[in-house]
Amino acid sequence: MTTCRRERPILTLLWILMATAGCLADLNEVPQVTVQPMSTVQKLGGTVILGCVVEPPWMNVTWRFNGKELNGSDDALGVFITRGTLVIAALNNHTVGRYQCVARMPAGAVASVPATVTLANLQDFKLDVQHVIEVDEGNTAVIACHLPESHPKAQVRYSVKQEWLEASRDNYLIMPSGNLQIVNASQEDEGMYKCAAYNPVTQEVKTSGSGDRLRVRRSTAEAARIIYPLEAQTVIVTKGQSLILECVASGIPPPRVTWAKDGSSIAAYNKTRFLLSNLLIDTTSEEDSGTYRCMASNGVGDPGAAVILYNVQVFEPPEVTVELSQLVIPWGQSAKLTCEVRGNPPPSVLWLRNAVPLTSSQRLRLSRRALRVVSVGPEDEGVYQCMAENAVGSAHAVVQLRTARPDTTLRPGRDTKPIAATPPMPPSRPSRPDQMLREQPGLVKPPTSSVQPTSLKCPGEEQVAPAEAPIILSSPRTSKTDSYELVWRPRHEGSSRTPILYYVVKHRKVTNSSDDWTISGIPANQHRLTLTRLDPGSLYEVEMAAYNCAGEGQTAMVTFRTGRRPKPEIVASKEQQIQRDDPGASLQSSSQPDHGRLSPPEAPDRPTISTASETSVYVTWIPRGNGGFPIQSFRVEYKKLKKVGDWILATSAIPPSRLSVEITGLEKGISYKFRVRALNMLGESEPSAPSRPYVVSGYSGRVYERPVAGPYITFTDAVNETTIMLKWMYIPASNNNTPIHGFYIYYRPTDSDNDSDYKKDMVEGDRYWHSISHLQPETSYDIKMQCFNEGGESEFSNVMICETKARKFSGQPGRPPPLTLAPPQPPPLETMERPVGTGAMVARASDLPYLIVGVVLGSIVLIIVTFIPFCLWRAWSKQKHTTDLGFPRSALLSSSCQYTMVPLEGLPGHQANGQPYLGGVSGRACVSRVHGSRGCPAATVGCPGRKPQQHCPGELAQQREDTNSQLRQPIVSNGYDLQNQQVARGPQCASGVGAFLYTLPDDSTHQLLQPQDCCHLQKQPVTTCQTAVRRTSESPGLESSWDPPYHSGPRCCLGLVPVEEVDSSDSCQVGGGDWSSQHPSGTYTGQERGMRFSPSPSVHVSFETPPPTI
């Protein structure tokens, strides 16, 4: 019993000693986060739980929210912390952001990768009009649904025949993209289709405002055409996910669809299979990136006409490893940590020491993906973290740095070994890299150069500043497909500064981040390097620095693209390749774009920063996809690293042709990061990855020198017979951001070998297009360019050859051909080959108002020109009608029959053959003689040139025979029905004097006037008092019409209507008095010779006759 009691204290002491030893061992252990918090999307008011597991487990765990420490639970914020668990009771706008857990122990601290908490939401559908979709019967129809913005991604539903379809069924196939494919469409599938978006977190459902109407048509034969997609597509997929490339074709007979990848048949790839005509790729990997071609053919038309291309990019989450050059660093020496990062797109990198972000300083030098600590001291001990993040995930790796006194020997323990990197953490959605301070991607290995000196001590141990960045002279483009000539020079050549010992040049392919940097050491006296074994049509980045006795100097950077190698099946022209690189120079399709399939631009590549002046820098970037609409502008934002705050707008409204801008007004000694956004008419892109930190060091004395690299002509186009339009691009970084004043454009006929034949146009400012006019028709021209400033001109650009259009003749001799513009032609697909130097006219949105105004004005002028002849005709018709009313058919009267009526006043009665003449009681009167020509009487009305003969009463006795033939009394019908007219016979003349009344026929007689070929005069005695009176009941306004007796026989050519003769015995009884009251009064409207008849008020003329003699 006593022995047992003595053994218990001993066992307890041993246990305490073992626990203490374990704790002491754990004190030197590197902390790790074994379970990272996961990004979450939650609805407003929902509960969010974030977990964090650390090793060793007894470590203290704290949390950060948007970079700020959370001191335990915050009731006001609604955040509760229990060791490794953070709970948000009710999510709101104030608790949305980025969270990190931090594990602390005496050896140091480590932070987890950030977890993003996002508020779920579902936006409304954009307003759209109804679309009519036509498809041939038996083919596949595609109904596209343009889902609104949603977090997380919305699920699509379709209204089909009054029923909502949530999953594929029957011949209805819902694709991952949200499109509805109707297989083997028939007449029964016609109708209206609408789609709806469903958010699985908020459980909201929103329906599109307009639907699409499907029409199924029947055709006899139609060539194959691809109805979806309508243009080349760029698809981004995360590694390990499945991918479906849609390709739907239509035609009669139904076409056959084939696929190819990078010019080779898709049959060689085992991971692909077909879903109808769509291509399905299981478990994508990096090797699945490339260009896929879908081709449809049915034997009708051109077999290669229906082609569409997909550009597939496989994104990979980051993979990080960190290395320490020396495990234990004596005080006063330098330590170098290298972080190797892989991922696509290239991840951004952030360095931390004991969970605190690091910035560049005199002792801490952040260069690419390396961290160098100069003159290590005890304060530099701790846990160093390399954290990488891109759009599809994040990862980090840690290493512990230990220091020792110079005279102390310390064996490295297990804690000095690098810690394996954590697996990549995929975000719940593409993360926002701008919300975390990071360093730009770069993989740095110690330079391995044969010219590297053995000692970097400066003579006299004087303090020397690092070498300045060299000036890169090479153009960012090369026509070579597998090599690139890199040319540079020292910034201050021949100066008394510390001499450069050697250069280190690194290059790597941007689109393939898994490749390591290729590093080359170049002697100080060599300023040229040829980079070989490059891939055609690929984007590369180059970083180089000069080394002097102070170590590595400032870095100069350039990005270039190699030339494309033509392929027999898939060929992309240089112009269209440039268009993909420079969305600002993109061609617009002549067809109306489908706005539903368009989107804001893609985020540009990470910008590079170079020194401009003491307080300014140049920010340079490379754009990506434009989302279907040309990029309208860029904007640059910056952020100070040592201050907490949001990103600040530095400048905006940067033209799409400019890929570099100077940012001024920076503070000395402050570290900045920059990012770029692209904007088109549909909105702005996501921000680019932030640049690496830039410290304003106060460099001054910059000299603006002559530009070396010239612009690059992207395409040319013949507008008409005498004009050629060209566009170009210019990257200031190719001339080390040297400012320029403008451009010189040189052109000459291609068949000329004399350089003096070049003509020069000058373009000033930031304009990147020009029209060369006054050229010769159907002539080929060589075109090249230079940029210039006060220092001189640059080297010549590439030479483009373009031929003007031929002059078109109308085919009529002696008439010059009309000036016509060539009709605009739709540009081909981006990836189809076209000879360099040709292109379609660039359609600009600013031309639309002028086009509308021109159409409206043209229509107005056309209407006016059309109505002027009509109005003139109407006026002429009215004038002619008015003239006819005054004298009907006067122009039709024959010249062979003319007459003149002159009133006889006071003519005494005379007789011929026992019949009295017309006469009067007093006065003198002259009567016009009726002239006859070959049996046809003449009238002065028809031929006013002939003067009538006048006779006085004394002469009438000798003209009895003529008078008898003239005083015949026909009655003019004047267009009225003669059968319905009553002949009024005058009573016996009481006074022996009768009145004879006469009036011309009105315009109704036009219908009865007919020309006659011959007229005959007949001598016939008439009674002087014979008259005819007509009354018409239908026309009460017309009281009477009287016609003097001219001649008898058939109607003459003078155009008078038939007359009616009345016997003398029945016509009138003569007396000594006047006419009875039953006589209607007649009117006579007439004018003198040479005047026209008009419908003026009637002039009453009376003829008195003596009583007849018995």
Swiss-Prot record:
Tissue specificity is:
Highly expressed in embryonic somites, limb buds, dermomyotomes and in the neural tube.
Q: What's this chain's function? A: Component of a cell-surface receptor complex that mediates cell-cell interactions between muscle precursor cells. Promotes differentiation of myogenic cells.
Q: Which InterPro entries match?
A: FN3_dom (IPR003961), FN3_sf (IPR036116), Ig-like_dom (IPR007110), Ig-like_dom_sf (IPR036179), Ig-like_fold (IPR013783), Ig_I-set (IPR013098), Ig_sub (IPR003599), Ig_sub2 (IPR003598)
Q: Which residues lie on this side of the membrane: Cytoplasmic?
A: 872-1110
Task: Outline the inducing conditions.
Answer: Up-regulated during early stages of myoblast differentiation.
Task: State the organism's lineage.
Answer: Eukaryota, Metazoa, Chordata, Craniata, Vertebrata
What's its membrane topology?
Single-pass type I membrane protein
Skewed-composition ranges (Polar residues): 1075-1086
Describe its assembly: Part of a complex that contains BOC, CDON, NEO1, cadherins and CTNNB1. Interacts with SHH, DHH and IHH. Interacts with NTN3. Interacts with CDH2 and CTNNB1. Interacts with CDH15 only during the early stages of myoblast differentiation.
Q: Which SUPFAM superfamilies match?
A: Fibronectin type III, Immunoglobulin
Q: List the disulfide bonds.
A: C52-C101, C145-C195, C247-C294, C339-C386
| Protein name (Swiss-Prot/TrEMBL) | Brother of CDO
Q: Where in the cell is it found?
A: Membrane
Native source organism of the sequence: Mus musculus
Parts of the chain on the Extracellular side: 26-850
> Which Pfam families would you find in this protein's record?
fn3, I-set, Ig_3, ISET-FN3_linker
Q: Where is the Ig-like C2-type domain?
A: 31-118, 124-208, 229-310, 318-402
| Annotated GO biological process | axon guidance; cell projection organization; cell-cell adhesion; positive regulation of myoblast differentiation; regulation of striated muscle tissue development; smoothened signaling pathway
Record keywords, A-Z = Cell adhesion, Disulfide bond, Glycoprotein, Immunoglobulin domain, Membrane, Repeat, Signal, Transmembrane, Transmembrane helix
